[in-house]
Amino acid sequence: MAAATRVEGAGSAGGGSESARVLIYSHDTFGLGHLRRSRAIANALVTDRPGVSVVIISGSPVIGNFEFGSGVDYVRVPGVVKLPNGDYRSLNLNVELDEAVGLRAAIIQQTADTFGPDLVIVDKEPTGFRGEIVPALERLKERGTRIVLGVRDVMDEPALLVPEWERKGAVDALAAYYDETWVYGLREIYEPLSGLALPGEVRQRIAYTGYLRRSLPQEPGFMRYPKSTKGPFILLTTGGGGDGDDLIDWVISAYETDAGLDLPAVIVFGPFINRDRRRSFAERIARHPKLDAIAFDTKLEYLMNRATAVVAMGGYNTFCEVLSLDKPALIVPRTSPRLEQYIRAMHAERLGLVRMLVDDEAERDPARMAAALRALPAQKRPSQVIVPGLLDGLDVIQRRFAGWLAERPRRIAISEAAE
């Protein structure tokens, strides 16, 4: 009876069966990708649903810079940051990592207890960072909360993903706590969990949604873009910027070497770029008439929509934006410490959606990049390739959410009848 009472009372913010509370745990130890994906899903869930409230839990230091839809808010936990050697440390607090994780876990559990979500969506990590969400998952499961794991289209190559998930107890957690797994991609492109020894019932609960379509935001009223954006230009984005130094350097070198490149380039550094590297890049850019740069743009979709073509590393969110805004794209994926971007770019190039240029340090020839940039504007757009369901991700999530909302009264009635 307790579970039935909780579900009936959970949606106090709105009316009828459309009232619901959703908690999203956004993995946040590196870059912007997880936060931006969680934000897109949260905004979709509250669209035309005034009774739905979504809380995002994140440790991202820039979450406050983003706009969220009505009904969406966030709780920021103390941040952690991934170091170049693969270790982690507390981002701002002068405490040991274990203490920071303990504090994060306590805030997560308190938020879950107080907010009382009907649905929980966990991004990427079934146990969270260092197992921090497991205590909350145990209590949520006892209350009958529906729990979903959401993963991007590509995690990593199986040889690395399998031991990582074994070490974290991720498969056991997936079987114990989760009702569904949503893959934000297409099975025809890649199966991110195929190498894992998942129980049959877990594998049956995997749903492929398609990629998450991005809509065009309103024009930023406070953002001043370079003059070069008033005409045709190439946009270079490395996402958060924490690992995009080599690509930025390669593109700048191409312009410095080849005066015949027609289109100017606008480079978005990202908020996590190394300060010294950014200063060095800015000096080189200032000396070149066809190069401009901006630090960071929370409405990158607007700038990308104005661009003629895009150069990027091919993280999940940028890939979704390239597809949604239908831009010819040159993807230069990183190949360490994960092969995620390379695998995505390889399969996307196979379908003709993008062109890939592998960043081999030994062959990082400016002339090679210049040739790729010169060919980019004439490259076909993603929409010229027909892939059914390619950008249906948010629509599928909304339909599954709506179906679950419609089923709740029936499930409550069954629960009460059983009592």
Walk through the language-model features, giving the residues of each.
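C-terminal amphipathic helix plus adjacent low-complexity
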Residues: 2-10, 14, 366-419
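Conserved nucleotide-sugar phosphate-binding/catalytic loop shared by glycosyltransferases and other
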Residues: 19-21, 26, 44-99, 103, ...
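A donor-sugar binding/catalytic signature common to diverse glycosyltransferases
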Residues: 299-343
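Donor-nucleotide binding loops and adjacent catalytic segments primarily
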Residues: 196, 211-309, 362
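A short, glycine/small-residue-rich beta-strand->loop->alpha-helix junction that serves as a flexible
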Residues: 26-39, 63, 244-245
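A nucleotide-sugar donor-handling region in carbohydrate enzymes
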Residues: 152-246, 272-275
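Conserved nucleotide-sugar donor-interacting segment of glycosyltransferase catalytic cores
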Residues: 109-175
